[in-house]
């Protein structure tokens, strides 16, 4: 975190570095190149059986109340939730285990921290693993992979149909759109 972002970013630019961000508001505010959040295509096949409906894993980061509210709402609708919320990062699970848990679920939960607009990795993970997504990030509607059949905006969409949303099949996203979020595409952006 920069103490004086405008001044600090200017100093970094003067060193010859190209700056980019995955947050569209930061890109506009600080005149930085906007780039998509990225992910590496899964190299191994993960289990296909589903053992839970909704999955969240992450630190609470001032989101605990919203996470608990969402979990209760989902469970009251008859959905099985797997929420892993460690107290510290050291108490968390490994990333391979995280991906395994994600693969065992129908839907990924993505609750952004306040003032965050850019995508977290969860929407891109959901995209690559063909999972539904429940998010509170209303800005997700502007992304090319957005499809209301796959992405439920918590706080905007009606909660009446959330169970049907989670249980309905994922609508396939075209491969050419997925490629835009692959790390190799991101790297190509920076190659001369």
Range-by-range predicted roles:
Residues 16-20, 52-55, 78-83, 107-108, ...:
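Hydrophobic beta-strand segments of well-ordered beta-sheets in folded domains
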Residues 22, 35-37, 84-86, 154-156:
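Conserved beta-strand termini and adjacent loop/short-helix elements that scaffold enzyme active sites
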Residues 58-99, 138:
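Catalytic donor nucleotide-activated moiety binding site of glycosyltransferases and closely related
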Residues 1-75, 181:
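Catalytic core of nucleotide-activated saccharide and alditol-phosphate transferases
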Residues 3-5, 89-92, 116-119:
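Acidic-and-aromatic substrate-binding clefts and catalytic sites of carbohydrate-active enzymes
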Residues 96-192:
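Catalytic binding pocket for nucleotide-activated donors in carbohydrate/polymer assembly enzymes
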Residues 1-3, 81-88, 155, 177:
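A generic structural motif
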Residues 26, 39, 61, 88, ...:
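Residue-level detector of flexible, active-site-proximal loop/helix-junction positions
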């Amino acid at each position: 975190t920069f103490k004086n972002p405008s001044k600090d970013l200017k100093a970094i630019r003067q060193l010859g570095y190209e700056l980019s961000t995955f947050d569209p508001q930061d890109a506009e505010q600080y005149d930085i190149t906007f780039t998509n959040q990225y992910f590496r295509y899964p190299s191994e096949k993960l289990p296909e059986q589903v053992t839970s409906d909704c999955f969240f894993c992450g630190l609470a980061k001032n989101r605990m109340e919203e996470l608990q509210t969402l979990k209760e709402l989902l469970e009251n609708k008859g959905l099985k939730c797997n929420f892993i919320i460690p107290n510290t990062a050291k108490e968390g699970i490994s990333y391979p285990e995280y991906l395994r848990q994600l693969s065992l679920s129908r839907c990924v939960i993505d609750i952004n921290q306040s003032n965050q607009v850019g995508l977290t990795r969860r929407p891109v993970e959901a995209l690559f693993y063909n999972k539904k997504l429940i998010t509170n990030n209303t800005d997700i509607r502007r992304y090319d992979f957005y499809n209301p059949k796959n992405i439920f905006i918590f706080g905007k969409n009606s909660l009446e149909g959330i169970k049907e949303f989670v249980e309905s099949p994922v609508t396939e996203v075209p491969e050419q759109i997925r490629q835009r979020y692959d790390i190799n595409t991101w790297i190509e952006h920076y190659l001369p």
